[in-house]
Amino acid sequence: MRAKSEGLAKQFETKAQEAVAVIEMLSDADWKKVTAAERWTVGVTAHHLSGGLEAVAGIVTGIVSGAPSRGNFTRAMLDEMNAQHAKEHAGCTRAETLALFQKGAATAFAVVRGLNDDQLAKSGTVFTDAPPMTAEQLIMLGLLGHIDEHMGSIRKTVGM
């Protein structure tokens, strides 16, 4: 059965299309505004979200295939990686961010849509300082929730 994965894929597709529409509408001035939640520019926040899509899809694939965990990887380490990403991509452009988003979204959509309900229930270690997560939980948090979180912050920052 693929009813759950089909539903998750449709939710993801809708959220991804909405995110692209918002990113495309941002002005140059909007792109440089700083979000209250992340304390990054709107552009860096959008780039962070875009870059995470393919990474999360890869972790979901690892969980469902039973691949060993990535070793010692904590939530604090992720926070450090995100802070470094913000510095490295401070000058990111809307065009490169949209291209990254579309590439990552296509990968994530294909992964989610290709799963069956048994695979969604498989669990694995995502962070060594947190309980294991199922593939479905990671999709809900790391894809759907991540889009909601950062696009909500962007919308609030630019007044949409």
Predicted regions and their residues:
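Structural signal for well-ordered, non-membrane alpha-helices
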Residues: 16-24, 53-57, 61, 102-116, ...
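Acidic/histidine-rich alpha-helical segments that form the ligand environment
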Residues: 80-122
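Long, hydrophobic N-terminal alpha-helical segment
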Residues: 12-44
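Short, flexible active-site loop motifs that bind/organize anionic cofactors or intermediates
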Residues: 21, 35, 87, 110, ...
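Short, contiguous alpha-helical
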Residues: 32-80, 123-160
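Surface-exposed helix-capping loop/turn segments at secondary-structure junctions
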Residues: 25-31, 113-121, 160
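Extreme N-terminal tail/first-helix region
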Residues: 1-17
